[in-house]
Amino acid sequence: MNIIEIIELKKNKKKLSQDQINFCISGLVNKSIPDYQISALLMAIWFNGLDDNELYFLTKAMIDSGKIYKFHPEYKKILIDKHSTGGIGDKVSIALRPILVSFDLGVAKLSGRGLGFTGGTIDKLESINVNTDIDLKNSKKILNIANMFIVGQTNDIVPADKLLYALRDVTGTVDSLPLIAASILSKKFALESDYIFIDIKYGQGAFCHDIETAKKISNIMKNLAKKFKRKVYFVLSDMNEVLGNTVGNAIEVKEAIDFLKNNSDVGTYFKKLMFDLVTLILLKTKKCKTKKEAKEKINYVLENKIAFNNFCNWIELQNGNIAKIKNDTFFKPKYWTNIAAWKSGKISYKSIIELAEIGVDLGSGRRKKEDKIDFQAGIYLHAKSNEKIKIKDKILTLYSSKPIKQDLIDKAKKIIKIS
């Protein structure tokens, strides 16, 4: 087979066969095809797309490039996997799993790190010392005891995706919808769960800038899931606001734990999305018959600390700092500064991406993959867009392990509008 002929076919809007796609992915992984030729193919796909069959062939080839995590028949409970396309302040994955375990469900997840303004679940968990570098054997052991685990993506799970993404990242092909669908679902299908729930974010702080794009990608993934005969459900959620009151790592874990403890100090939209997602999962898995029943049962497991206890059991098995979690001392930044309202009025933020960039400047995110994260760095939002505030009311609190520079404070103030 000839890679140049395959590139020419896709360039001229022709369909690729399964053998041709397998040849390309195999050549990518074993390095028999140079990066520049795979990059040319990616650009041809960006311009001309993939039909349903081509996308199935690509996703299958990506899955087959590595190992598949299997838990049944040894594990008897329904196994859930939930994925988010990422957003600012998204700590849903941390809070969701302990609640689902309360309903006799198992929850497994392969997760990633953050780059830029979106924080990764792995970074957030490492802020409380959770070990996410766990192999399949130990993942099964933790699942059997705690009915949940979260681990980082390893080199033996869909290695083709890691290689493809690195090329997409430097060739302007990250935003190809078929390539996004293949990337997400290859990782989800490499873990053999019974149900997959995908939260597709849209808006300022998401890769889908509008709901129409979110609908397109969800439809592509729905068709792909049917070809694999997998149960996949989608939620489209607004990312024009920070999800919750916090942005960072340990500070986001704290808000997730506050939710599990049924404390009131959590963001309204975060709480609503949590209830919506858990309700959907309980209905689809037939753990509840109605939305009303689901809401009542969710409130019960929160009010009685059942979900929080599940969280603690799981964290302890993955070597998290359980003592600091139980006595609420894991988030203790050395430096902080408050930004207060200079007049009364209605607040708005110029851009939540710029707000998230302040968090990165404080140390909560990475500019480059090798950057070290300050787990104590972050932002607390005392006021959200369209809320009325009075003069001297706190708007933001900035946190860091290092002294916070005045130019960063000034930068944060410029994002705030009071009308």
From Swiss-Prot:
The keyword Cell inner membrane does not apply. Keywords: Glycosyltransferase, Transferase. InterPro entries: Glycosyl_Trfase_fam3, Glycosyl_Trfase_fam3_N_dom, Glycosyl_Trfase_fam3_N_dom_sf, Nuc_phospho_transferase, PYNP-like_C_sf, PYNP_C, Pyrmidine_PPas_bac/euk, Pyrmidine_PPase_CS. It catalyses: thymidine + phosphate = 2-deoxy-alpha-D-ribose 1-phosphate + thymine. SUPFAM superfamilies: Nucleoside phosphorylase/phosphoribosyltransferase catalytic domain (SSF52418), Nucleoside phosphorylase/phosphoribosyltransferase N-terminal domain (SSF47648), Pyrimidine nucleoside phosphorylase C-terminal domain (SSF54680). GO terms for biological process: pyrimidine nucleobase metabolic process; pyrimidine nucleoside metabolic process. Belongs to the thymidine/pyrimidine-nucleoside phosphorylase family. The enzymes which catalyze the reversible phosphorolysis of pyrimidine nucleosides are involved in the degradation of these compounds and in their utilization as carbon and energy sources, or in the rescue of pyrimidine bases for nucleotide synthesis. This is Thymidine phosphorylase. It comes from Mycoplasmoides pirum. The gene is deoA.
